[in-house]
Amino acid sequence: MQVYLERARSRQQDFLYPLLFREYIYGLAYSHHLNRSIFVENVGYDNKYSLLIVKRLITRMYQQNHFIISANDSNKNAFWGYNKNFYSQIISEGFAIVVEIPFFLQLSSSLEEAEIIQYYKNLRSIHSIFPFLEDKMTYLNYVSDIRIPYPMHLEILVQILRYWVKDAPFFHFLRLFLYNFCNWNSFITTKKSISTFSKSNPRFFLFLYNFYVCEYESIFVFLRNKSSHLRLKSFSVFFERIFFYAKREHLVKVFSKDFSYTFTFFKDPYIHYVRYQGKCILASKNAPFLMNKWNHYFLHLWQCFFDVWSQPRMININPLSEHSFQLLGYFSNVRLNRSVVRSQMLQNTFLIEIVIKKLDIIVPIIPLIRSLAKAKFCNVLGQXISKPVWADSSDFDIIDRFLRICRSLSHYYNGSSKKKSLYRIKYILRFSCIKTLACKHKSTVRAFLKRSGSEELLQEFFTEEEDIFSLIFPRDSSTLQRLHRNRIWYLDILFSNDLVHDE
C-alpha cells in the first residue's frame, strides 16, 4: 500500500504561491460569485473589488505578531482595519481557485489514460444511487450505516494536501490564513468552529473536506481490489487480507479443530459502497462479520493514517429487514412480504410460504418537521405559524414562495413508495401561507379566507406532481397509471432541496 500511495502522489505541483497575486485569479472568483457580493469592498472603495487590497491584506498577515492576537478578537481590529470575516472570504476564494487548478489539470490528464479508467471501472456517478436502490437493495441482507468523521483540527486537512502539492510558501501562507480565521490556538477545533468556517468559506472548505474524503476512499478502493483479486488457495481460510500470510497456518489449525472438514476457500462477498455528503453505507448479502471486518478497516484507517478519531458507535451493522437507514433524505429498508400458496401434487396437498422482498423508501416526516420549524414555518410540534418576514411582499409573491417550497418537496420525494405521508407537510405549508397572508392584512385566518376567497387557490398545495403528466398522456393511458403507481426519481433532486441534506 505504501508503494501505491507513493506512486499516486508522485505527480505533485509546484509554484502555486505566485498565483495568489495574479489579478485574473480573483477575477475568476468574482465572476463565479457575483451574485453573492462577497467581493464588494468596504465603505470608501467605490464598491469594487481590488487586487491591491488583497495584496495589502496578505502583507499585513505576514507583518502581524500572532502571539498578540487573541482567538476571541472582534471582527474589526488593528490588524485588519476592516471587516475581518468579509476579507477572509476574499482570500479564501482566491485559495480555492488557485488550489483547484493543478488538480483539474491532473484529472484531465488522468482521464486520457486507459489504465486509470480501467482501475476505477467500478466507480459510478452519484446519480447511480437511484438504480442501486431499486435493483440491488432487495438482494442484500446487511447494511452498515457510517457517518464520516470530521477532522479534529484543520491542520490535518492541510497535511493531507501537502502529500500532493510541494510549495512551501503556499502552505506557509495557508497556515497563516487559517491561524487568523479558524482559532488555531485551540488544540482541538470544535465542530461549531468548523461549521462557521465552512459557511463563511464554502468553496475552500468543501475542497479541503472532499480531498480528505477522496484520499481515504482511494485507499479503500485499493484494499478492496487487493482483497478481491487474490488467487484461490486450497485448504486455507483468509479472513484478514492484510498480513494474511502470517495468519494462514494458524487459521487453518483453528478451523480444523472446530469443524469436521477444512474449508477450501472463504471468499469475500461483493461489497457495495455508496457515499453521499458526510455519510456512506456498506451493503452486503452475506454474513455480518465480514462487514465488521471492513468497519474495523475504516476505524483504523481514520485513526492511524488521518489522525481522525471515530467512535465505534458511529458505525452500525443491521439487517435490512429490521433496520431503516437514512440516505438522500429518505428512510429506506427492505420489507418482507409473506404469502402462503396452496399447491397440489398428485393426491398430496401442501402449503408453501413465499417470501418476497420489497424495497420501502419512506419520507422522514419528523426530520422534515424539524427542518420546517428551524426555518420558522411551524413550531416543534408541527403547528403552522406565520412568516412575518415575508409579509411585506405581495399576495402573489407570498403564495408563489410557499408553492415553490411545496412543489420542491413533492418533486424530491417522488421516489417514495408512500407519497401520501407528505400531506402533513403540505398542510403545514398551506396553513403557514394562510396565516402569513392574514398577518399581512391584519385579519384572522377565517375572516381572510371568507373575504378573499383564497381557499380554492390554495388547493394547489395538494396537487400531485404526477398530475402534470395528465397533460401529456391520456387519462386512460396505461403509462399514466404506471406513473401514479411507481416511484419516479428525478436526477436534479441532489441540488434542489436544502431541507433534506444530511448534516
UniProtKB/Swiss-Prot annotation:
It is found in: Plastid, Chloroplast. GO terms for cellular component: chloroplast. Keywords: Chloroplast, mRNA processing, Plastid, RNA-binding, tRNA processing. Its main location: plastid. The keyword Chloroplast applies. The keyword Cytoplasm does not apply. Transmembrane segments: none annotated. InterPro entries: Domain_X, Maturase_MatK, Maturase_MatK_N. One of its GO terms (molecular function) is RNA binding. It comes from the Eukaryota. GO terms for biological process: mRNA processing; RNA splicing; tRNA processing. HAMAP family: MatK (MF_01390). Belongs to the intron maturase 2 family. MatK subfamily. This is Maturase K. It comes from Vicia villosa (Hairy vetch). The lineage of its organism: Eukaryota, Viridiplantae, Streptophyta, Embryophyta, Tracheophyta.
